[in-house]
Amino acid sequence: MIEKLTFGLFKKEDARSFMRLMAYVRPYKIRIVAALIAIFGVAATESYLAAFIAPLINHGFSAPAAPPDLSAAAGILSTLQNWREQFTYMVWGTENKIWTVPLFLIILVVIRGICRFTSTYLMTWVSVMTISKIRKDMFAKMLTLSSRYHQETPSGTVLMNMLNLTEQSVSNASDIFTVLTRDTMIVTGLTIVLLYLNWQLSLIVVLMFPLLSLLSRYYRDRLKHVISDSQKSIGTMNNVIAETHQGHRVVKLFNGQAQAANRFDAVNRTIVRLSKKITQATAAHSPFSELIASIALAVVIFIALWQSQNGYTTIGEFMAFIVAMLQMYAPIKSLANISIPMQTMFLAADGVCAFLDTPPEQDKGTLAPQRVEGRISFRNVDVEYRSDGIKALDNFNLDIRQGERVALVGRSGSGKSTVVNLLPRFVEPSAGNICIDGIDIADIKLDCLRAQFALVSQDVFLFDDTLFENVRYSRPDAGEAEVLSALQAANLQSLIDASPLGLHQPIGSNGSNLSGGQRQRVAIARAILKDAPILLLDEATSALDNESERLVQQALERLMENRTGIIVAHRLTTVESADRIIVMDGGKIIEQGTHDQLMFQNGYYTMLRNISGKDTAAVQTA
């Protein structure tokens, strides 16, 4: 179908992704049919306006004619011919033509205007609704993607897929559909008019169509990779802007404005360079298509003048032919120039479908425990983030009892956070297995598995919403009293009292209205409210001052009673009360025991503790 619509310019393979997206418009087929009828009305009135010239010149300025002989017609064609002659006489042949002709012209223009408005409105409406549905599905797909995908894919690329490419694919489709149908109908109608007026001259006009098709094919092939690179560059620019916005404090603190500007300028120059290529091709395409049309028009005028001098055609027919051909020029030009936006549309559709086809996070679990007891075991677990053979965890084995508080300590890169990320399956092991209450976590449904954990990470993320909604995010059915209790447990009563809005005060994008310690405590309150059987605290108290840390530590002590807790900490003073301390290095456990036991061994933990003690003392002295 696409080959016929584009006269062989694009093949079925080019439009595979686009045709897949067109499934989204099926619910609106009635509106599309109505738009097609309106487009047909535009084409019909446009064609008749060209044919309007011949009777205007041949009959409009002559004396009223005698009524046509409407004898009994034999057959459909004769009947239609009688109707046409009767209509022509009613408009052009009577003495009333001084007002019937202008009125008829106004009616034609009004009908064309109504049809044009209807087709434009309906197609735009379908376009907006289709974009909305595709973006909804893309967002739903994004929610199913793995943590690894989000870590490896720049945010600018995701934004480009969901915003730019969706808009380019569907909005261009609406415009192109209108152009292809309306202008093809107009060209077809005008061609019929030309054939009716003078079939010999019409052959010359028809000959320019293959030339225009070859011209469009040339520019399509030339710009395919340029348009694709341009779309990728826009994604890179989105990423640069997002990173600079999110990291504005780092940019300002390290005087990185020049570096940020250089990054942006480099991407911007690439987009400008590619845009120039597209513009040059578009600008060059129009003059060449105009030249072909002008040559055809010149040949037509030459032959028509010769025919007129030899009595083969009337002045009215000649003028109508020229007007029809001139009216044909604009739609032909639109059809000839459609290859570039069509190429953009198809490539954008490829990007959208590629995103929709991204494999979701694997969830082969079938078990759905309501609430686990909290016994955890790691068996021969390996984790490799890269393909160079370096393991984040190497033959890791650990058993954690129900209600036990286990602290993971070690240098950066020793694998502490990897252990925490394995439990909710943010990271998948390369080998080995992990069990909770004797059940392999791979056999538990992801939503049920993650319902067993409350996580507070050192990388706090808060939503641009109120304090109340951010805390309630972990339990949407919680009431104000429960949220207030969680905030109080996280030592945030003073924050509530400081604002007349209390719980419902806005906290800004990612908690921009809060201090670093307050942001951390809001995340802790969110974890407290969830009341999960297993707590994962990844540097949860790293941003708190000493007094706040003491109060929050007390709240966490009460919260972790009869619950399993895994604590990751660099500040070893915060893990002294843990039931067991796991000392890690190079993805392996090298020591474990209570604080007193490890200090008595005078090993690796003691060295880390001494270093941590010196750092703490230095901070307190400062």
Curated annotation (Swiss-Prot):
Residue ranges occupied by any ABC transmembrane type-1 domain in the UniProt entry:
33-344
User: Could you say which residues bind ATP here?
Assistant: 410-417
**Tagged with keyword Protein biosynthesis:** no
| Alphabetical list of InterPro entries matching this protein | AAA+_ATPase, ABC1_TM_dom, ABC1_TM_sf, ABC_transporter-like_ATP-bd, ABC_transporter-like_CS, ABC_transpr_lipidA, P-loop_NTPase, Type_1_exporter
Q: Which PROSITE patterns match?
A: ABC_TM1F, ABC_TRANSPORTER_1, ABC_TRANSPORTER_2, MSBA
Pfam families to which the protein is assigned, alphabetical: ABC_membrane, ABC_tran
In the bilayer, the protein is annotated as:
Multi-pass membrane protein
Domain (ABC transporter): give its ranges: 378-611
The catalytic activity, as recorded, is: ATP + H2O + lipid A-core oligosaccharideSide 1 = ADP + phosphate + lipid A-core oligosaccharideSide 2
Q: Which residues are listed as membrane-spanning?
A: 32-52, 91-111, 192-212, 286-306, 312-332
> Can you name a GO cellular component term?
plasma membrane
Enzyme Commission number(s) from the entry: 7.5.2.6
Do you know which SUPFAM superfamilies this protein is assigned to?
ABC transporter transmembrane region, P-loop containing nucleoside triphosphate hydrolases
Please name the GO terms that the record assigns under molecular function: ABC-type oligopeptide transporter activity; ATP binding; ATP hydrolysis activity; ATPase-coupled lipid transmembrane transporter activity
Keyword presence, Cell cycle: no
Q: Provide the coiled-coil residue spans.
A: none
Here the disulfide bonds are none
Q: What main location does UniProt list?
A: membrane
What keywords were assigned to this record?
Answer: ATP-binding, Cell inner membrane, Cell membrane, Lipid transport, Membrane, Nucleotide-binding, Translocase, Transmembrane, Transmembrane helix, Transport
Assembly and partners are described as:
Homodimer.
Give the protein's function.
Involved in lipopolysaccharide (LPS) biosynthesis. Translocates lipid A-core from the inner to the outer leaflet of the inner membrane. Transmembrane domains (TMD) form a pore in the inner membrane and the ATP-binding domain (NBD) is responsible for energy generation.
Let me see what the UniProt entry remarks about domains.
Answer: In MsbA the ATP-binding domain (NBD) and the transmembrane domain (TMD) are fused.
Q: What is this protein called?
A: ATP-dependent lipid A-core flippase
Question: Which organism was this protein described from?
Answer: Neisseria gonorrhoeae (strain ATCC 700825 / FA 1090)
UniProt lists the gene as msbA
